[in-house]
């Protein structure tokens, strides 16, 4: 049985000075089997302040996960740079074997990170959504 990525989650965190009521986290989750993406904004208390679900065409989901499986295997676990810019990102990928790969960073993209952003932004555009997520926060 081939081990496939079944779920991709990207969290962006604002680690700067802010009030607990401020939006300090964005979470994007893309599900392979359900053909959908869930976008959430959370405040400093961890309370979901907004949530949007976007349905994605099956062929686009397949293309996205095939791309991840081809490129993310060589990722290191840490792309943090010793810079205080006040933000951090974390990617988690769940596999059909129940393995979870976790990768984190700050001001630099992981390899092919810009292409991942392009896929996600196309899902948002195709879903006619107005959300503008930070994603990796590197742009």
Question: Across the structure, where does each feature detected by a protein language model lie?
Answer:
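Short, flexible N-terminal segments of the mature chain
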Residues: 20-45
């Amino acid at each position: 049985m081939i081990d496939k990525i079944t779920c991709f989650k990207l969290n962006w965190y604002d680690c700067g000075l802010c009030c607990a009521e401020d939006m300090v986290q964005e979470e994007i989750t893309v599900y392979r089997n359900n053909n959908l993406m869930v976008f959430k904004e959370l405040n400093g208390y961890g309370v979901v302040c907004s949530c949007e679900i976007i349905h994605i065409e099956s062929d686009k989901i397949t293309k996205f996960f095939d791309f991840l499986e081809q490129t993310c295997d060589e990722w290191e676990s840490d792309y943090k740079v010793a810079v205080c810019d006040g933000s951090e990102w974390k990617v988690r990928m769940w596999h059909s074997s129940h393995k979870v790969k976790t990768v984190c960073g700050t001001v630099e993209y992981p390899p092919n990170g810009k292409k991942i952003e392009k896929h996600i932004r196309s899902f948002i555009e195709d879903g006619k959504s107005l959300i503008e997520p930070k994603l990796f926060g590197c742009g």
